[in-house]
């Protein structure tokens, strides 16, 4: 919670700090923050964006490979051109070269015993008949249940009273179905089913149009299109369109004083105070724990912030000399019940002659992988890739390098990604809108607050648009 001593110390240093003013201060220069700032500036209001990092982009971060040929996304990496209209508009605006996700060929699955089998993309894995029938039943049940929820205001106390694991058990899910659903939560949120409210997870699915659409690699799905230049293209483009001086990098916010008595909010950052009429914060909820608020946030917001959790979620990009998996008839998509990678996807860039498998390390197997030495991490993934694609004899010869970034060590993402989760009991007791509702002169954006495509870039952009509309309306009336 907000520490009054810390707050007093922050405020006491105000007399030594330099100051300036703006109509609106936006905290965070990711997609939500930059979108909000763009819209505020378009309305002829002055704006300052305070970003803790030394770069823009937030959880979109693209890096060139060491040889200068090809780019990998350490963070968010997919969009689509059907129902992610706002981020797709940015792709067109900034001349993104789009790469369609490969779904031609077989997928591979690794079962709980380590056995490997393959199946065509879009079909169920090659389980026995009873297991296959139950996986389809549980999948369709989750799809149907998530579709009954209101996207912005889900309300089901029964679903929120239990974990997603308990929900599955109450529906008689088989061992194979439980393992399949665990792959979903690990790949989507880096968490185990036991740690997530059933209501929260199902609403998360609904925010992306449903479980099937959110997990799909085909048109309209959550993983349909990549950008050759990398997804940070959008944030860099938005930043380049801002007037000079709007974005302040390396400026972490330490305190927000909404109790000045003069109608202005004071935002404290590194020896400087910025006074504003309105503040839009777009940082992840775990980061809000590190900001002192005066007065403190309302109980509903404070409880939500203290309740959110990240699991373990990291992408490891394995670069190879050739797309040997394609030559063997695979599309590159795999799932595993045991890990280390729960899901693998082909993220190659043919135009750059770069052949890449992105391994998603999430949840319990992710934590185990993180505890390994760098050499053992690499070897464990090479072994798994060799097994999944029947390439144990060539995988090490084909291997070039591993590229990764551990968001769990990133202070300004809140020590995790892609999106926080909630345990049972929070949504129903606080109300689904508690986090995004304005309070005093503070407005809340970021992909966590989104109704549609929560946890995705589309959700971030839409949340920034919403927050901008809120402040513009209040400042213009």
What is each model feature region?
Residues 251-252, 257-328:
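Central helical "cap/lid" subdomain
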